[in-house]
Amino acid sequence: TGPYVLDHWDKGQQAIFKINDKYYGDKPYFTQLTLLFPEEATWLELAKSGDVDVVPVATSALNQSVDGYQFVEKSAGRAQGVSFPYQNDTGDSWNGTWKIGNNVTADKAIRQALNVGVNRQTMCDEIFSGHATPEYTSVDTRDYANPDAKVKDGDVDQAKAILKEGGWEDTDGDGIVEKDGVKASFDLYYPPDYLDRQSLATVFAEQAK
């Protein structure tokens, strides 16, 4: 149990918590907590209204300030990244919509080339205005992380060498490498309600070119 219990919930709108009288520890300072669930695009305007005490900062507003609010930077405790299917196109789909497998990303050379070719620090600077640190394994900050798993990224020449060694070459001069008649082109999906993931997908795609 915790110091608060759910008192009222409006699905998709808010959740109100009150003090848990049966909590074994000290009573909290605040007698009530109200958590709102606004769209990310409205976070900044919500702060400007002065109607909330704490509000997340969208990536598009990281360099902006709001009177009466102090910017506090905390570790998110999670990593953001791009993941690829490891298996070839199975011909099946999930929920009748999403294809299972991809003939391009299933090739190890493609994944390795993208891993060393993209520049993570540039992504942190462009998307998060420097309020982020590069992540290489998704568990870099954990006690069980393996520092040897990190790679030197931003090395386009090495990425090209990996692709060539793996049999991927641009034989028709269109700027896209291919192998066995398959072009190294694929769709990259992101949830539209998360602006940071949209930005990550966009910047990643530009670097991958």
Which residues are covered by each model-predicted region?
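Extracytoplasmic/periplasmic ligand-capture domains
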Residues: P3-I127, D143-G175, D180-K209
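Short secondary-structure junction motifs
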Residues: F30, P134-Y136
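Short, solvent-exposed turn/loop segments enriched in Gly/Ser/Thr/Pro and often Arg
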Residues: I127-T133
